[in-house]
Amino acid sequence: PILGILAVPATVIWIVAITNAVNLIDGLDGLACGVSTISSMTLLVIALVVSEGNVAILMAALAGGCIGFLPYNMNPAKIFMGDTGSTFLGYILAVVSIQGLFKFYTIISFAVPFLMLGLPIFDTCFAFIRRIAHGQSPMHADRSHVHHRLIDMGFNQKQAVAVLYVISAILGLSAVVLTTSGPVKAMLLLLALCFAGAISARIFLGANGKKNDGEKPDEKGEEK
């Protein structure tokens, strides 16, 4: 094993982290469900490429369930998945993403799961770093997640969710190409990653975004 004796603790940390990361982005209607749909479809494509039929079937079922649920969860939501639903999605994605699908290159083995789950991972990391820097508990709920930043910049819920879908899709596509291409071609993915990174940086660092004073409470999103 690449990690040796660190494999077991690293696996536990990964599963707990991803499970909670997906739960933490469930602050706007349809966000966690849509991002999980994109991630599961990314895993489905990769599983088909590497001929992992069982994983492909599981991810097809998960993506189908999310797609069926999504119309009722979009703003204005008629049904909410709650913490139980979002943590379930995070757990399944975390477990399947470390099942050994990515054996082409050592760097790819590490990079692909981080890419396809990049949005919840980076949002959670920034949230924890920000809270610690402000002397708060990392588990303290606030309104400074990436989706809250978009709302504060003047986007409505549907627009904010659409922007995050695009970022998640770019990262998912990058994960697929990285799995199916050699190292030289994989370097070209830096263009897509830089594009996604520029958008993310603008969101996270745009501290003085426009606020909608007349916005309804349900447009503000849930604190996580």
Tell where the protein language model's regions lie, with residue ranges.
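PRPP/pyrophosphate-binding module of the type I phosphoribosyltransferase fold
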Residues: 19-20, 29-32
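Transmembrane alpha-helices and membrane-interface helical segments
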Residues: 16-20, 96-99
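Membrane-helix boundary/helix-loop-helix interface segments in multi-pass membrane proteins
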Residues: 1-13
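Alpha-helical membrane-protein architecture signal
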Residues: 10, 14-17, 143-147
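Alpha-helical transmembrane segments
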Residues: 32-224
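Asparagine-centered polar/low-complexity signal
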Residues: 20-23, 73-75
